[in-house]
Amino acid sequence: MAQQRALPQSKETLLQSYNKRLKDDIKSIMDNFTEIIKTAKIEDETQVSRATQGEQDNYEMHVRAANIVRAGESLMKLVSDLKQFLILNDFPSVNEAIDQRNQQLRTLQEECDRKLITLRDEISIDLYELEEEYYSSSSSLCEANDLPLCEAYGRLDLDTDSADGLSAPLLASPEPSAGPLQVAAPAHSHAGGPGPTEHA
């Protein structure tokens, strides 16, 4: 049986083998069940004692019950094989299922795209309103200071530079303890001779 399954088989041959297995298993169940019913019937006196006949009937019932169980397991295996056959070979159904799934995914994608577009528009509107509010508040602050913000920062930089320039000569001036400043006398040229000497 394993060698037959290993051989390459066409679909028709495989289906025929499934059909034969189904008929054989059902026939086995029916025959064994019928024989069990017949064995349960009380017969007339025979040459065999009743005790021996009872043991023989008991053993026969066990064997036929095992045959019924074996046929049932074979039917369950047949159902599993049929499912596998349909999954692997029923290409139209598989393609239809794939198409339905693709359609569902496309619908879901379109819905997500619509929601994202709506969310983008709402965020754009909110961002525009926030920018207007921000720039209007900034312009009101500049008008309150009578200067634009850029000019205020520029004037602040100029004041800082001028303060640094004034501090440099103050650092170079002499200390008060150095004494009085000496004033140089202007030189006068006298043609007639030396004049009076000026004392500082």
From Swiss-Prot:
Pfam families per UniProt: Med22
Cross-referenced InterPro entries: Med22
Residue ranges of the region described as Disordered: 166-200
UniProt key word Coiled coil: yes
GO cellular component: core mediator complex; cytoplasm; mediator complex; nucleoplasm; nucleus
Keyword terms: Activator, Coiled coil, Nucleus, Transcription, Transcription regulation
GO biological process: positive regulation of transcription elongation by RNA polymerase II; positive regulation of transcription initiation by RNA polymerase II; RNA polymerase II preinitiation complex assembly
Compartments it resides in: Nucleus
Chain segments annotated as coiled-coil in the UniProt record: 93-122
GO molecular function: transcription coregulator activity
Primary location class: nucleus
Domain of life: Eukaryota
Similarity comment: Belongs to the Mediator complex subunit 22 family.
Function text: Component of the Mediator complex, a coactivator involved in the regulated transcription of nearly all RNA polymerase II-dependent genes. Mediator functions as a bridge to convey information from gene-specific regulatory proteins to the basal RNA polymerase II transcription machinery. Mediator is recruited to promoters by direct interactions with regulatory proteins and serves as a scaffold for the assembly of a functional preinitiation complex with RNA polymerase II and the general transcription factors.
Subunit-structure text: Component of the Mediator complex, which is composed of MED1, MED4, MED6, MED7, MED8, MED9, MED10, MED11, MED12, MED13, MED13L, MED14, MED15, MED16, MED17, MED18, MED19, MED20, MED21, MED22, MED23, MED24, MED25, MED26, MED27, MED29, MED30, MED31, CCNC, CDK8 and CDC2L6/CDK11. The MED12, MED13, CCNC and CDK8 subunits form a distinct module termed the CDK8 module. Mediator containing the CDK8 module is less active than Mediator lacking this module in supporting transcriptional activation.
Name the UniProt record assigns to this protein: Mediator of RNA polymerase II transcription subunit 22
Species in which this protein is naturally found: Homo sapiens
